[in-house]
Amino acid sequence: MSSRPVRVGIVDSGINPRDRQVVAVEGGVGIRFRDGRVERDSSWEDLLGHGTAVAATIRGHAPAASLFSIRVFHRRLEAHMEAVLDAIDWGVEQRLDLLNLSLGCTNREKEAAFVSACARAMDLGVTVVSAAGTSVESSFIAVAADSELEGEEIRFEPGLLRASPWARPRGVLPREKNFHGTSLAVAHVTGIAARLLSRGERSLREALSRMSSGR
């Protein structure tokens, strides 16, 4: 089966399209919640570096993927939930295949809206890969970090995938000095999922669980 370009949206601090590991970005959007309303603009490039590290890690697993920057982090790695929900909607509008949400949601008051938005996206054909929240949900592929895992390794648990917390190696920079943690674990799973989709895989959850290093 011939491969097809997989469209991946990265909800984060933006992406630097000139980064040598990222190679290219198809486009994107900047999203803010300000003065009680959501605003969209063209400011999707990264000023913080986090989203670029995520994009580079995804690119390492899926070199042919089409990457889209959905910037919700601006001056710091924080975002209003309304901006995150709109980011998910934007991914649906653009008919993306995958949405990478390294941020997740640990606020129980806002979690219901987040889970609902993810479920809607999944129903409309956009697979959401996100940091695990406060409960196990089937509305997205939930990911947590495991420092014992490396690169392609995945560990399957009921309702949860564990992956490496380390970013794609960058020259002589020690990995502990680069961004690391659950955000990068999510990126590893998203990148592997993109590669599986490009090969025609239809059931991502099953395919990812089969890759589990514990099986």
What are the roles of these predicted feature ranges?
Residues 19-21, 110-111, 152-153:
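Short glycine-/acidic-enriched loop or helix-start segments at secondary-structure transitions
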Residues 11-14, 70-74, 101-105, 131-133, ...:
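Active-site-proximal beta-strand/loop segments in catalytic clefts of secreted hydrolases
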Residues 7, 66, 125-127, 139-141:
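Proline-centered loop/turn at the N-terminus of a beta-strand
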Residues 73-138, 177-187:
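Substrate-binding/access-modulating region of protease and related hydrolase catalytic domains
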